[in-house]
């Protein structure tokens, strides 16, 4: 059996990918551990980019669909030999989040055509309420990054339903909007995105706005 298959004994059916490496066996002890909750398009992409850029030494993927999390972790793990510094990526349970430095929450019901982010508010707040007590029990010292939509509402809701200090709860906010704006301006002006300094402020949604007076190229 290949060395990256390691069953998680606590919960039959979940298999860890690279678990022995994550525990530091045979290599130096790992430094940074990040847990991603939600193995959908956003969560799996985040895990992949962290692996490619070596943002973390250990990445845990958690999803209600255990097979999905396992499949995504395996795909990332099997491409690891191509990276300069392979990262240990594996699927696990909330218990496996213990010791995480950062927890990124991407879980939630995706928007349907014609639906606004705010239409999802109550549905995804309920999802968050199920996740919050489980993850904070095992990773009480982590910094939490909320990505699920509506991100502003869910970031506030996470603060209200947990004991995590506000300074350790971060919402992705308009970061993606700002990135899209800079990319579009760079394309339109035929310049490098690194030379575009413009921002999107406000809510990540219909009320977001661009303060053009401070935009620079």
Language-model region placement:
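Rossmann-like NAD(P)(H) cofactor-binding subdomain of soluble oxidoreductases
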Residues: 116-182
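Conserved N-terminal Rossmann-fold NAD(P) cofactor-binding segment
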Residues: 62-99, 115
């Amino acid at each position: 059996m290949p060395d990256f298959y390691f069953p998680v004994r606590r919960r039959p059916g979940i298999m860890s990918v690279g678990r022995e490496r994550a525990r530091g066996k045979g290599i130096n002890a790992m430094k940074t551990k990040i847990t991603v909750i939600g193995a959908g398009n956003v969560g799996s992409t985040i895990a992949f980019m962290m692996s490619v850029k070596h943002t973390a030494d250990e990445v845990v993927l958690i999803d209600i669909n255990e097979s999905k999390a396992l499949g995504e972790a395996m795909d990332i793990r099997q491409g690891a030999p191509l990276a300069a510094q392979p990262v240990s990526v594996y699927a696990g349970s909330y218990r496996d989040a213990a010791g995480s430095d950062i927890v990124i929450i991407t879980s939630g019901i995706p928007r349907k055509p014609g639906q606004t982010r705010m239409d999802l508010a109550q549905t995804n707040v309920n999802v968050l309420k199920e996740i919050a007590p489980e993850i904070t029990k095992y990773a009480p010292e982590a910094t939490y990054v909320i990505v699920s939509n509506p991100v502003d509402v869910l970031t506030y809701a996470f603060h209200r339903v947990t004991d995590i200090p506000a300074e350790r709860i971060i919402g992705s906010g308009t970061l993606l909007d700002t990135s899209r704006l800079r990319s579009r301006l760079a394309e339109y002006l035929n310049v490098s995105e690194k030379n575009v300094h413009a921002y999107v402020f406000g809510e990540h949604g219909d009320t977001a706005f661009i303060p053009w007076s401070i935009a620079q190229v």
